[in-house]
């Protein structure tokens, strides 16, 4: 009995201990993820590049140090730093293992149908090219392949050697302290030279059709080939490989030909010689064929089918979910025609329903033209004939400032579609329809994407700008440009297309030289951060705050005293466009492409009462409402659709439209019609052909819905020639289904991909300098030349949190906010004190020597005697002086003094005022006074060689230093020694290309005096003056084109000399290079003077045409003076090219005036 009890007690105790052990082992401790996933959760995804081992590193980089220059001597021992006991490989290696491997593959593949088709295809291509040659084409009419035999063996590689030096890829890591350690990166290019011999007996039989209707038979056998072959694998500028003979190989052909059963040696010699020429022309260095397969088959153009089936799991699309995208690195970017430039780049991501290329490049707009009782609306039209035989279309050639057309925001280059519902086919029809219309007429027009013209907007809002702005961030002489930037940021209309910024830049130069870029960075726009909610500063931050359940900042209450400016176009009333938040943050470039991004419309919002004189982005600007949660956004979709459909019907008066729009801005709406989501990364430094993002600032989280189909990725850099402009470096569109399938391939739902960037539109010129030699090779495709970007994708599981991204965004944003908010109040208070005491013009009588216009009424000063402000060079008639002081009393010189004082108060290393980047000051100073001079390339690369320099930021910020004031003898509007504001040349005129930047130049010590430039320009005004205007323009533009080419070539030569001078260590060679550089600089300086010389002729034509226009406007000005007094300070003067009463039925010339 006791034994049974003991057994029972033991069983019970054992069961209890087992359960207790199970509890402690299985339930007490939380399940741990695998080691690699735990590391990723703590540190984020880490991208590791493949690296060579120590022995391979020694083979690639170590042996070349002791190798003789001729390459014949064997390499020395290994370096002490890496495997000293292992001897370096010999210079030449035997490849018996490779020969055996190739022979085995040849035996298995020789008789397959796939190999036979590939060989016959290649032979037929050679036949086609042979028939196109002059010699063979005269005798041969056709070649057909009768038989082909690949031979008994393959080429035998006797020896092979690595061509040194081997250049390693950039890693972004600093070099070793002494530079002795071998690089740990893979090589950028591998080149091998092999001695090859072939005796395999490859032969083919050909049937030849001669020109006489006869046929012949040709048998060609490749008996022997001996030569040195170079095999190259390279990543520059894109990944490819090629092989080619180093020198002419020794080739023996065995040829037999028959014609009617008789030998024909003439045909035999032609074929043999042609085959040898083909090998020399195509397969002997420096000629070769760029190849991708079989090693790099991914280097092919990707395409998207129009009708694609979508994958669904039950009722859910495969792509729906939360996708985390992490940027890792970008490489091989083509920046301004070079692969070696350093630049700050950033990336934008967008979820969309369409691909980048599928977006339309123009938009249809509707505007209400208020003609009133005026005879002219200020338009000059041109009929463009269609190339397909149909009727042509009418485009706007010029728009007169302050005219009804300018107020309605019609711009040069707009294509008129219909007026009052009647389709437009001729310029005469436009004249009649507008003449017969009443006070108001509806105009339907098409505007190319990227076109911008802020002139009319500037004039329309000039009064309000003078009353509400105290531009403390402007430099001397830069008041109009800075105001243009601010107003353009408010008044521009970004179409629904996925815009290409490179296209924006070129389109603006094509239509108007001074048009600001559509994608001005908020860094370059004056902004008061202290009065904006976080949602208005960054949509990304706002989204993260909403996700994290943070309270949204309250909306700023508005003041009743401010009135919104009048609105013109009906499409602005779209609430989806009204409530679109400003893209990007106040510290980073915007998020182009910007889908459905419309103008943030003015409202009655204003800054605090305590800051009456503070510089704001625009006092009337609406504060964009913060983004709401997903459910609220979906509820707003139906409202957006209804308002979008009703938008074309809303043609109201200015006050009514403004009132409606202001009321609509309070409605929370979706930021785009197709539920697009955009994100932008932080800027990174791209150098040594590589740019890396930090893990803490390169991740974003997208909520993918069923309407999203593509992830559009674009890389951008700043445009050095346009303030606030951005240039697209490349883009790529990914199917979200491919991304989802790639993530689902592994259980951790993530994968890594390196994506080749597509060319921006319009493409950068890749054949000019960096790729001039490569573009001449067969197989070259410039679409491969724009670099690549490496991205990590991860689909988050349901319920899986990713606090890493939110934390990163907050870390990225908040320090800037704290810094700016803490800095601004002191400076704003100081600005207000200075602005109250110094804001009046100080006019004095001035006699002008050149054609001058009144800055107030915009009329010409015919007597050349007027009043000019002593501080800001503002010019006005003596009769306009009292009106000017009463209405526009703000003097621009006050802004310059304030800005100069604030610069001195600013701490060293601190961000410049109002979010402007440090180099904006230097860029802003470029537009102080427009001067003719350097072309784009000279400005960018060789200003030091010309003994000219841009006004630097340090010079601007020196105490007591002021910019060069305009001479009292000249007005800012005159064309003397300045770039003309009116362009009469074609859109691609060299005069525009060479003078679009308006750089302010200052003479260096020892450089040319300013009088030299003035003298050269004055002499150039008389060039070809005796010729007709059109012929004169053609001759001048021809010379400018020629000079541009010469400058480009000289710049390329100069850059090569600079690189050689940096690389060489020989003192004698360095002195020779210095002398060559000096001569190159002198040549560049001479070419620059010639460019100024011929550009002056273009300006002379512009001046003459403007004078003739003013003389005509003077004749009719007396009829319009009474009308001008009734326009509420929005139209100062109407410049008419031709009154309607003088237009006859035969006005079908090149241009018509309306």
From Swiss-Prot:
Any coiled-coil regions, as ranges: 1028-1063
Localization: Endoplasmic reticulum membrane
SUPFAM superfamilies: Cysteine-rich domain, PDZ domain-like
PDZ domain location: 366-449
Transmembrane segments: 2-24
Membrane-topology descriptor: Single-pass membrane protein
SMP-LTD domain: residues covered: 91-294
UniProt entry tagged with the keyword Transmembrane: yes
Superkingdom, taxonomy of origin: Eukaryota
GO CC annotation, single: endoplasmic reticulum membrane
Modified residues (Phosphoserine): 496, 521, 538, 967, 980
Protein's UniProt keywords contain NAD: no
Keywords: Autism spectrum disorder, Coiled coil, Disease variant, Endoplasmic reticulum, Host-virus interaction, Intellectual disability, Lipid transport, Lipid-binding, Membrane, Metal-binding, Phosphoprotein, Transmembrane, Transmembrane helix, Transport, Zinc, Zinc-finger
Ranges of biased composition (kind: Polar residues): 988-998, 1132-1144
Region of interest called Disordered, as start-end residue ranges on this chain: 66-90, 548-612, 955-999, 1132-1154
PROSITE patterns recorded: PDZ (PS50106), SMP (PS51847), ZF_DAG_PE_2 (PS50081)
GO biological process: cytoskeleton organization; lipid transport; mitochondrial calcium ion homeostasis; mitochondrion-endoplasmic reticulum membrane tethering; regulation of cell morphogenesis
InterPro entries registered for this protein in UniProt: C1-like_sf, PDZ, PDZ_6, PDZ_sf, PDZD8, PE/DAG-bd, SMP_LBD
Gene3D superfamilies referenced in this protein's UniProt entry, alphabetically: 2.30.42.10, 3.30.60.20
Main location class: endoplasmic reticulum
Zinc finger (Phorbol-ester/DAG-type): 840-891
Low complexity bias (residue ranges): 70-85
PANTHER family listed in its UniProt record: PDZ DOMAIN-CONTAINING PROTEIN 8
Complex formation: Interacts with MSN. (Microbial infection) Interacts with HIV-1 Gag polyprotein p55.
Purpose of the protein: Molecular tethering protein that connects endoplasmic reticulum and mitochondria membranes. PDZD8-dependent endoplasmic reticulum-mitochondria membrane tethering is essential for endoplasmic reticulum-mitochondria Ca(2+) transfer. In neurons, involved in the regulation of dendritic Ca(2+) dynamics by regulating mitochondrial Ca(2+) uptake in neurons. Plays an indirect role in the regulation of cell morphology and cytoskeletal organization. May inhibit herpes simplex virus 1 infection at an early stage.
Name of the protein in its database record: PDZ domain-containing protein 8
Source organism of the structure: Homo sapiens
Gene behind the chain: PDZD8
């Amino acid at each position: 009995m006791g034994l049974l009890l003991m057994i029972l007690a033991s069983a019970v105790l054992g069961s209890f201990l087992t359960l207790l052990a199970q509890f402690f082992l299985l339930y007490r401790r939380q399940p741990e993820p695998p080691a690699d996933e735990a590391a990723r959760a703590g540190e984020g995804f880490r991208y590791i590049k493949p690296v060579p081992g120590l022995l391979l590193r020694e083979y690639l980089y170590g042996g070349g140090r002791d190798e003789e220059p001729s390459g014949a001597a064997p390499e020395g021992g290994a370096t002490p730093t890496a495997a000293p006991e292992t001897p370096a490989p010999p210079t030449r290696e035997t490849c018996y293992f490779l020969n055996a491997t190739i022979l085995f593959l040849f035996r298995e593949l020789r008789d397959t149908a796939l190999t036979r088709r590939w060989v016959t295809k290649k032979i037929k291509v050679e036949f086609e090219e042979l028939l196109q040659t002059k010699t063979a084409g005269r005798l041969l009419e056709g070649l057909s392949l009768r038989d082909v035999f690949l031979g008994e063996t393959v080429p035998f590689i006797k020896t092979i050697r690595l061509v040194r030096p081997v250049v390693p890829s950039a890693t972004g890591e600093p070099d070793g302290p002494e530079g002795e350690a071998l690089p740990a990166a893979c090589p950028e290019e591998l080149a091998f030279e092999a001695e090859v011999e072939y005796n395999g007996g490859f032969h083919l039989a050909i049937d030849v059709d001669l020109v006489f209707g006869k046929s012949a038979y040709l048998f060609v056998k490749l008996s022997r080939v001996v030569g040195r072959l170079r095999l190259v694998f390279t990543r520059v500028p894109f990944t490819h490989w090629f092989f080619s003979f180093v020198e002419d190989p020794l080739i023996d052909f065995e040829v037999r030909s028959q014609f009617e059963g008789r030998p024909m040696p003439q045909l035999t010699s032609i074929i043999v010689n042609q085959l040898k020429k083909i090998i020399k022309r195509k397969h002997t260095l420096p000629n070769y064929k760029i190849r991708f397969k079989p090693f790099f088959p991914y280097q092919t153009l990707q395409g998207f089918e129009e009708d694609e089936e979508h994958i669904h799991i039950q009722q859910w699309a495969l792509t729906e979910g939360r996708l985390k995208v992490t940027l890792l690195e970008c490489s091989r970017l083509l920046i301004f025609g070079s692969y070696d430039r350093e630049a700050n780049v950033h990336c934008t991501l967008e979820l969309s329903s369409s691909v980048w290329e599928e977006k339309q490049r123009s938009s249809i707009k509707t505007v209400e033209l208020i003609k009133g009782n005026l005879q002219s609306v200020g338009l000059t039209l041109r009929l463009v004939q269609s190339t397909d035989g149909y009727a042509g279309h009418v485009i706007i050639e010029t728009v007169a400032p302050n005219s009804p057309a300018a107020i309605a925001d019609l711009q040069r280059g707009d294509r008129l579609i219909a007026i009052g519902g009647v389709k437009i086919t001729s310029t005469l029809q436009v004249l009649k329809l507008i003449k017969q219309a009443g006070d108001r007429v509806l105009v339907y027009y098409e505007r190319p994407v990227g076109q911008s013209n802020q002139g009319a907007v500037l004039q329309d809002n000039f009064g309000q700008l003078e009353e509400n702005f105290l531009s403390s961030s402007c430099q001397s002489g830069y008041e109009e440009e800075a105001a243009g930037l601010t107003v353009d940021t408010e008044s521009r209309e970004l179409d629904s297309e996925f815009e290409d910024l490179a296209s924006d830049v070129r389109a603006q130069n094509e239509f108007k030289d001074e048009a600001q870029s559509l994608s001005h960075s908020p860094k370059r726009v004056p902004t008061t951060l202290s009065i904006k909610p976080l949602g208005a500063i960054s949509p990304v931050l706002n989204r993260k705050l909403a996700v994290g359940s943070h309270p949204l900042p309250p909306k700023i209450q508005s003041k009743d005293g401010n009135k919104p400016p009048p609105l013109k176009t009906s499409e602005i009333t779209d609430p989806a466009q009204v409530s679109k938040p400003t893209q990007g943050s106040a510290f980073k470039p915007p998020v182009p492409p910007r889908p459905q991004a419309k103008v943030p419309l003015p409202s009655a919002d204003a800054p605090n009462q305590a800051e009456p004189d503070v510089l704001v982005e625009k006092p009337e600007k609406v504060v964009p409402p913060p983004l709401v949660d997903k459910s609220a956004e979906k509820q707003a979709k139906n409202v957006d659709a209804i308002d979008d459909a009703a938008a074309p019907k809303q043609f109201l008066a200015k006050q009514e439209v403004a009132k409606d729009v202001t009321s609509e801005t309070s409605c929370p709406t979706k930021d785009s019609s197709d539920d697009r989501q955009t994100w932008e990364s932080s800027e990174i430094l791209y150098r040594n052909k590589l740019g890396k993002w930090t893990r803490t600032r390169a991740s974003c989280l997208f909520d993918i819905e069923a309407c999203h189909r593509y992830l559009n990725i674009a890389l951008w850099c700043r445009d050095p020639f346009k303030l606030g402009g951005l240039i697209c470096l490349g883009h790529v569109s990914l199917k979200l289904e491919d991304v989802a399938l790639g993530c689902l391939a592994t259980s951790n739902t993530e994968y890594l991909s390196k994506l080749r960037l597509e060319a921006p539109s319009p493409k950068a010129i890749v054949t000019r300098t960096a790729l001039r030699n490569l573009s001449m090779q067969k197989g070259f495709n410039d679409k491969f030349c724009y670099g690549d970007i490496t991205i990590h994708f991860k689909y988050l599981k349901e319920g899986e949190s990713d606090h890493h991204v939110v934390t990163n965004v907050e870390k990225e944003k908040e320090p800037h906010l704290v810094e700016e908010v803490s800095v601004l109040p002191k400076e704003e208070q100081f600005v207000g004190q200075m602005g109250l005491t110094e804001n009046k013009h100080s006019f004095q009588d001035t006699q002008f020597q050149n054609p001058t216009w009144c800055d107030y009424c915009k009329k010409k000063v015919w007597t050349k005697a007027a009043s000019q402000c002593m501080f800001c060079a503002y010019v006005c008639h003596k009769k306009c002086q009292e009106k000017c002081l009463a209405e526009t009393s703000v003097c621009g010189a006050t802004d310059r003094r304030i800005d100069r004082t604030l610069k001195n108060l600013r701490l060293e290393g601190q961000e410049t005022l109002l979010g402007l980047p440090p180099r904006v000051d230097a860029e802003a100073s470029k537009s102080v006074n427009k001067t003719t001079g350097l072309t784009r390339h000279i400005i960018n690369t060789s200003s030091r060689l010309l003994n000219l320099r841009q006004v630097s930021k340090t010079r601007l910020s020196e105490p007591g230093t002021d910019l060069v004031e305009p001479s009292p003898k000249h007005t800012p509007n005159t064309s003397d020694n300045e770039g003309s504001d009116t362009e009469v040349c074609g859109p691609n005129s060299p005069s525009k290309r060479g003078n679009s930047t308006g750089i302010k130049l200052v003479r260096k010590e020892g450089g040319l005096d300013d009088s030299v430039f003035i003298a050269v320009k004055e002499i150039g005004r008389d060039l070809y003056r005796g010729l007709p205007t059109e012929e004169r323009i053609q001759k001048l533009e021809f010379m400018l084109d020629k000079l541009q080419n010469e400058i480009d070539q000289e710049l390329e030569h100069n850059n090569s000399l600079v690189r050689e001078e940096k690389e060489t260590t020989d003192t004698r060679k360095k002195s020779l290079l210095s002398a060559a550089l000096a001569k190159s600089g002198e040549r560049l300086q001479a070419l620059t003077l010639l460019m100024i010389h011929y550009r002056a002729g273009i300006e002379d034509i512009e001046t003459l045409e403007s004078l003739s226009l003013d003389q005509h406007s003077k004749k009719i000005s007396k009829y319009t003076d009474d009308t001008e007094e009734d326009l509420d300070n929005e139209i100062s003067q109407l410049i008419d090219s031709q009154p309607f009463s003088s237009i006859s039925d035969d006005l079908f010339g090149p241009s018509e005036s309306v």
